[in-house]
């Protein structure tokens, strides 16, 4: 988990350096929601989807796609959001 948090911080910083406002719900919601409680995890996912609806783009980093990322990508495609893909080194592919 700590490795994922560090990566999310790096990717968020990269977005700022590119002139964007990063939104990383998985950094915010675990501060006050219990990710091991199924009801609270679902609430966090719902909140994340609500926030994503306000974004102009969805950025995907890395080659490993978790189940949560897969769900977000599927939703973004379904909603017609612009997806951008990057390597772990923040190189767009």
Task: Annotate each predicted stretch with a short phrase.
Residues 1-93:
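Catalytic phosphate/metal-binding cores of nucleic-acid and nucleotide-processing enzymes, i.e., regions
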């Amino acid at each position: 988990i700590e490795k994922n948090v560090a990566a999310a911080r790096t990717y968020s910083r990269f977005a700022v350096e590119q002139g964007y406002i990063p939104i990383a719900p998985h950094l915010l919601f675990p501060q006050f929601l219990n990710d091991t409680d199924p009801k609270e995890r679902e609430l966090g996912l719902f909140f994340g989807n609500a926030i994503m609806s306000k974004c102009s783009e969805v950025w995907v980093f890395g080659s490993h796609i978790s189940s949560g990322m897969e769900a977000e990508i599927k939703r973004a495609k379904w909603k017609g959001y612009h997806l951008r893909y990057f390597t772990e080194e923040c190189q767009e592919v």
